[in-house]
Amino acid sequence: MTPDARHAKDKLALTPELREAIREIAGTEHLLVAMDFDGTMAPIVGHADDARPLPRSAAAFAGLAVLPRTTTALISGRALASLRAVASPPVNTLLIGSHGAEAWLGPGSTGLTLEPEQKALLAEVRAVLEDIVKEAPGTMLEDKPAGVVLHTRLAPDDVADDAVAAARSVLQERKGVFLKDGKRVLETSVVNASKGEGVTFLRQITGATGVLFAGDDTTDEDALARLEPGDVGVKVGLDFTQAQYRVEAPVHVAELLEVLLQQRSIAVAEETPGTADE
């Protein structure tokens, strides 16, 4: 093996500290595995509809979903319908969409309902953003149940910066409108919610005694900030983070999930009474 090959392999490996943290949390009584999707389970792509989870990540996540005392969840900025379409999550995986504004907790879950005032405000927000997009080649809008997203990934940097600045100048003081910066996006919403609230909510309804969360975007910092002692937070990428641990890219998330599946499978098997002598 060449030095370059060894270096590439080393970069793919999880750190010993992260491996130990995974081993420890795998033994918790009830484990919540909560993952961001884009940039975490799936590589970032030019068109949102083309995103798909890496096969290894999807397989390990599905394996975790069927283990005893283990809950899997996706916490995404995507609308729930979009998240389901691209992620194809295991049937019992809980879903938090639109940065916490939407939730699917199983059959019978009700959808998000906006008040008339919120609907009117959302229409105003879209009209503002439509005018901006007309003058900013490469930008586009994405509608969500509670907001509109200004995408700038395909625009030149100067065009993207000007478009976001124009949107902020009009909307940041508008009462009832909430803005979030993401990677080449500006999220607008008429519902004040965050991925942090999503993590806290899922912990409460599942009774989780330990949470592992991984995410790549600035909006994932809200979720990382809500983690408690004994939880494991993982930043995907090289940007600033308050997470205890870091991996470089979605391919490393696949490795993380595979290690977690292995360790959690061992932990729940050791705690399950045998039937050989019965």
Roles of regions detected by a PLM:
Residues 2-15, 28, 191, 196-278:
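Mg2+-dependent phosphoryl-transfer enzymes with acidic/Ser/Thr/Gly-rich catalytic loops
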Residues 13-29, 82-89:
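Short amphipathic alpha-helices and their capping/turn segments at secondary-structure boundaries
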Residues 26-46:
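Asp-based phosphoryl-transfer active-site loop
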Residues 52-143:
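Active-site phosphate-binding/coordination module
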Residues 98, 105-123, 127, 180-208:
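Substrate-recognition "cap/lid" segment bordering the active-site pocket of phosphatases
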Residues 125-129, 162-171:
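Short amphipathic alpha-helices in soluble, non-transmembrane regions
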Residues 147, 167-186:
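Histidine/lysine/aspartate-rich catalytic loop segments that bind and position anionic ligands
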Residues 149-160:
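A short secondary-structure junction motif
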